[in-house]
UniProtKB/Swiss-Prot annotation:
Matches recorded under Gene3D superfamilies: Laminin
InterPro entries reported for this sequence: Dev_Signal_Modulators, EGF-like_dom
Keyword Glycoprotein: no
Lineage, broadest ranks: Eukaryota, Metazoa, Spiralia, Lophotrochozoa, Mollusca
Keywords: Disulfide bond, EGF-like domain, Repeat, Signal
Record-given protein name: Gigasin-2
């Protein structure tokens, strides 16, 4: 049995402000009426008896009552066949939990995602430029849907750059925002197309009270060592360093290993965040070694006292942002027995 103790230094959340257009069966590319429904001139479906929904895709007799439904349909989804959800236009996913156009946050970038029907023949792009800021098709993780995506770095200085608003919505927060255009026909914008705002919020994780934490309250001890095993406080770039972690104050735990290690720096003036994931699922990422141009090892070995196994991440000191401190986000896995 593994006991995980995640420690997160940087808090991220994703907020999307989206204006959804109504379903319009006159649009090209997979927006018709199903099961013999008739598309009205004004864009709504006239469904045959026994069917309902914006595209007539829901058979009335299959709709489940609240007592018979085991699915938690969100965003106005309708439960049918006890455990399935029929989603309104603008939402997808098994539980209708995913907006069809949304932004996700990463420490240094925004990922804009748009899901459209497989027959979609239109375009999705950032409003600044239809061609150079377009979302491109990528492999989809939603069945029977096409996925379009664009990754924009927070530091992007091109015409596709994001709008940055500090201290929004709260003091210390930073909101990254852009406007996305979705059309149903290539190189055309009509009254049935949509324009929507999407945004990501970096929440302020630096406010709080100072509190002394004992070894009993804090389950692991971390120390930075030089190659001779002596503690260090500061290093020059490219000097060897070992980050050592050992369990303290947890009964029956005989060892620890690093499952995930991410380092990042925050520019003191612009709040720009630069991050690099070094270890994931206990393995050193080759891309991190190549990008940082340093050797990295992640391993466990017996402590000097011979009573427990300690985790060690060995590398050379490096700089992400000149003049700014490095921070870390870590996941540890504790081992209840000494490995044999």
């Amino acid at each position: 049995m593994n006991k995980m103790s995640p420690l997160y230094v940087l808090a991220l959340c994703c907020l999307a402000t989206t204006v959804f257009a109504k379903y319009d069966c006159t649009n090209n590319g997979g927006y018709g009426c199903k099961y013999g429904g008739t598309c009205h001139f004004y864009g709504f479906c006239i469904c045959p008896k026994g069917f309902q929904g914006e595209d007539c895709g829901l058979k009335t007799e299959l709709i489940s009552t609240a007592a018979n439904c085991t699915a938690e349909c969100k965003n106005g989804g309708t439960c049918y066949e006890s455990d399935r959800c029929y989603c309104p236009h603008g939402f997808i996913g098994d539980m209708c939990e995913i907006p069809d156009t949304v932004a996700r946050c990463a420490p240094d970038r925004m990922i804009i995602e748009a899901y459209r029907p497989l027959g979609f023949v239109g375009e999705v792009y950032m409003f600044q430029n239809r061609k150079s800021c377009a979302l491109k098709q990528v492999p989809s993780d939603i069945r029977d849907m096409m996925k379009l995506e664009r990754v924009v770095l927070h530091s992007d200085k091109t015409e596709c750059a994001l709008t940055r608003t500090p201290d929004t919505p709260k003091l210390g927060d930073v909101t990254m925002k852009t406007t996305v255009v979705s059309t149903h026909n290539y190189n055309q914008f009509g009254p049935r197309d949509s324009i929507m705002d999407v945004s990501c919020v970096h929440t302020n994780s630096f406010q709080g009270s100072t509190k002394e934490i004992t070894e009993t309250a804090f389950p692991f001890r971390m120390v930075a060592l030089d190659m001779n095993g002596e503690p260090v406080q500061a290093l020059a770039a490219n000097e060897s360093i070992i980050l050592q972690f050992e369990p303290v104050g947890i009964p029956d735990v005989r060892g620890v290993m690093v499952e995930y290690l991410e380092v990042y720096s925050i520019n003191a003036n612009s709040n720009e965040v630069v991050s690099k994931t070094i270890i994931e699922n206990g393995c050193v990422l080759r891309t991190a070694q190549q990008h940082l141009e340093i050797p990295i090892r992640n391993y466990s070995e017996m402590x000097r006292q011979g009573t427990s196994w300690v985790a060690r991440s060995a590398m050379r000191a490096f700089i992400l942002l000149p003049g700014d401190h490095c921070y870390s986000s870590l996941d540890y896995a504790s081992v209840p027995e000494v490995p044999r």
